[in-house]
């Protein structure tokens, strides 16, 4: 296996490198180990939340698979930011930032220790795209392994996810439930370790890991508590050295066709709008031209076929019971919606893998539908453009009952202001809530608005009120919500010019978001507008605000598509 040690041999072979070897002898390597490929096992782990709590256990099984394949595995950590805990707090500014930090820390760790290949174990919303970005950036043989989602909770016969906890706050504030009922949902909605249970951002990105070909087929859906997690950990350890032998690296996998397949899968599952940002960032790292125009074109041909929360009533564990993500992919493949020649880390095109895969003899039970008779006839997400978002915006329509909305603007310059208004009952049917200065540069960090959106839905206003923001949404968001408005307010985008009472038109079917104000009036407002002073003058947030690009570019911070 000397041919697989192209990198580690430069660090650890020969007389010149004799002083390097004692460092690895001290952590358990033997003389024989120095002749084996060195495989990094990147793990996101933290006790500050359940999403990555169990991932350390998976390291042992990945290393077991690496050993079986003739390599030696050594683990290294990366950071974790728990989105759910930070929702509606100043900490949410660090969420999207952590994605790029994770990619950067992986680059620094593995490029400075000479690993020949690696397996990345991730769990929550930003660890996954951060790991995938690093896979493409480093372009070493690599496999992504998901830690798995938490089991759903139960309140009587009602299946609960964390979405219920957020929406129950709005229901309580609106007087629809008691404090005791809210407390009961809080206690029962997240019963095990693992990630949030619906097709929210974490499960969306795990699903897209399979669609992109960066993960082993079938590895996304088993719950974190399942013994199959350990099985896939061992198999991922074996697979990464097989990929190395075959010369399969992430840049050969993440092609236009792979991104196309990921977009199709995203729309068919009504996944998180955050995935648009993350796929744009992964494409950026791969130096593949894949833009909002591509998402727009694909979205118009793909219906929703999965009844997963928040678009439907089911959790990821329910999809797992009927075959998981491969069952989704096979339906899309048989309908001619996937590009079957896209290569995977398993060394074969995704079409070949799906041809061999057979679903379990379990009825789909309303969890999954055929493309010809879909759950919803339109895609889960639609790209909008218009004078309010010249560079684009993203609307999640799979979890909304209305595709078109017209109303009067109520403008708030922060999420906190908007939440206070919702809690005080100031938001009325027909309002278009505008939350601005929450974009990549303005917040900075483009925080998610789940606290506000869940409060709106919980108050019973989900179909009667729309929300438009230059910030982001949680994957658990539902209702009439438009985010990622670009350009953002902080750089003078038209959203900065909206005033209370302005009429706003949102049309998901036409892909339109329009501010019904004359160009002459907008120009007058533009001349009167001045950029706000930076919220931070030092530290990480200031650095991020200086580097980050707009949402339509994936909110990336890397100045180059090729970071090696």
Swiss-Prot record:
Q: Does the keyword Amino-acid biosynthesis apply?
A: yes
Q: NCBIfam families annotated for this entry?
A: ilvD, PRK00911.1
Q: How does it assemble?
A: Homodimer.
Q: What is its EC number?
A: 4.2.1.9
Q: Which reaction does it catalyse?
A: (2R)-2,3-dihydroxy-3-methylbutanoate = 3-methyl-2-oxobutanoate + H2O; (2R,3R)-2,3-dihydroxy-3-methylpentanoate = (S)-3-methyl-2-oxopentanoate + H2O
State the protein's name: Dihydroxy-acid dehydratase
Offer one Pfam family short name for this entry.
ILV_EDD_C
Describe its function.
Functions in the biosynthesis of branched-chain amino acids. Catalyzes the dehydration of (2R,3R)-2,3-dihydroxy-3-methylpentanoate (2,3-dihydroxy-3-methylvalerate) into 2-oxo-3-methylpentanoate (2-oxo-3-methylvalerate) and of (2R)-2,3-dihydroxy-3-methylbutanoate (2,3-dihydroxyisovalerate) into 2-oxo-3-methylbutanoate (2-oxoisovalerate), the penultimate precursor to L-isoleucine and L-valine, respectively.
Q: What is the lineage of its organism?
A: Archaea, Thermoproteota, Thermoprotei, Thermoproteales, Thermoproteaceae
Q: Can you tell me which residues bind Mg(2+)? A: 83, 125-126, 448
Q: Which GO terms describe its molecular function?
A: 2 iron, 2 sulfur cluster binding; dihydroxy-acid dehydratase activity; magnesium ion binding
Instruction: Name the PROSITE patterns for this protein.
Output: ILVD_EDD_1 (PS00886), ILVD_EDD_2 (PS00887)
Q: What pathway does the UniProt record associate with this protein?
A: Amino-acid biosynthesis; L-isoleucine biosynthesis; L-isoleucine from 2-oxobutanoate: step 3/4; Amino-acid biosynthesis; L-valine biosynthesis; L-valine from pyruvate: step 3/4
Q: Which residues carry this modification: N6-carboxylysine?
A: 126
The similarity annotation says: Belongs to the IlvD/Edd family.
């Amino acid at each position: 296996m000397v041919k697989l040690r192209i990198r580690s041999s430069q660090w650890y072979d020969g007389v010149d490198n004799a002083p390097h070897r004692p460092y690895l002898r001290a952590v358990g390597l033997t003389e024989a180990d120095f002749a084996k490929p060195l495989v990094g096992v990147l793990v996101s782990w933290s006790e500050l939340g359940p999403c990555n709590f169990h991932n350390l256990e998976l390291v042992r099984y990945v290393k077991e698979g690496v050993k079986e394949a003739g390599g030696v595995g050594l683990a290294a950590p990366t950071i974790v930011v728990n989105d759910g805990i930070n929702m509606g707090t100043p900490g949410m500014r660090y969420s999207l930032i952590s994605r790029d930090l994770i990619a950067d820390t992986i680059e620094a760790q593995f490029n400075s220790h000479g690993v020949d290949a690696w397996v990345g174990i991730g769990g929550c919303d930003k660890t996954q795209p951060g790991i995938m970005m690093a896979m493409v950036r480093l372009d070493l043989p690599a496999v992504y392994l998901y830690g798995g989602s938490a089991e759903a909770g139960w309140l009587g016969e009602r299946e609960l996810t964390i979405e219920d906890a957020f929406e129950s706050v709005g229901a309580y504030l609106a007087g629809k439930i008691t404090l005791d009922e809210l407390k009961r949902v809080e206690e029962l909605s997240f019963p095990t370790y693992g990630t949030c249970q619906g097709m929210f951002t974490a499960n969306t990105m795990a699903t897209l890991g399979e669609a992109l070909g960066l993960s082993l087929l079938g590895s996304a859906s088993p719950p974190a508590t399942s013994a199959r997690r350990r099985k896939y950990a061992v198999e991922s350890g074996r697979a990464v050295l097989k990929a190395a032998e075959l010369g399969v690296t992430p840049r050969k996998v993440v092609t236009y066709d792979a991104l196309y397949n990921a977009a199709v899968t995203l729309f068919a599952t009504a996944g998180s709008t955050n995935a648009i940002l993350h796929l744009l960032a992964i494409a950026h790292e791969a130096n593949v031209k894949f833009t909002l125009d591509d998402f727009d074109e694909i979205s118009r041909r793909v219906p929703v076929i999965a009844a997963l929360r928040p678009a439907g009533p089911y959790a990821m564990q329910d999809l797992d019971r009927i075959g998981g993500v491969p069952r989704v992919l096979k339906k899309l493949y048989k309908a001619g919606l996937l590009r079957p020649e896209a290569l995977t880390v398993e060394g074969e095109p995704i079409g070949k893998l799906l041809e061999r895969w057979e679903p379990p003899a379990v009825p789909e039970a309303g969890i999954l539908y055929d493309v010809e008779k879909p759950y919803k006839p339109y895609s889960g997400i639609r790209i909008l453009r218009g004078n309010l978002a010249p560079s684009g915006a993203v609307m999640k329509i799979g979890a909304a009952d209305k595709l078109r909305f017209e109303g009067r603007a109520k403008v708030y310059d922060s999420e906190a202001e908007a939440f206070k208004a919702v809690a005080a009952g100031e938001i009325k049917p027909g309002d278009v809530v505008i939350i601005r200065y929450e974009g990549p540069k303005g917040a900075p960090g483009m925080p998610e608005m789940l606290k506000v959106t869940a409060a709106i839905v919980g108050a019973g206003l989900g179909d009667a009120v729309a929300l438009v923001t230059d910030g982001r949404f949680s994957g658990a968001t539902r209702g009439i919500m438009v985010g990622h408005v670009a350009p953002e307010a902080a750089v003078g985008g038209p959203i900065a010019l909206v005033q209370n009472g302005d009429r706003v038109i949102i049309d998901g079917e036409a892909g339109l978001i329009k501010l019904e104000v004359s160009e002459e009036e907008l120009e007058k407002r533009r001349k009167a507008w001045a950029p706000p002073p930076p919220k931070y003058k030092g530290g990480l947030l200031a650095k991020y605000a200086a580097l980050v690009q707009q949402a339509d570019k994936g909110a990336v911070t890397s100045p180059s598509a090729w970071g090696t």
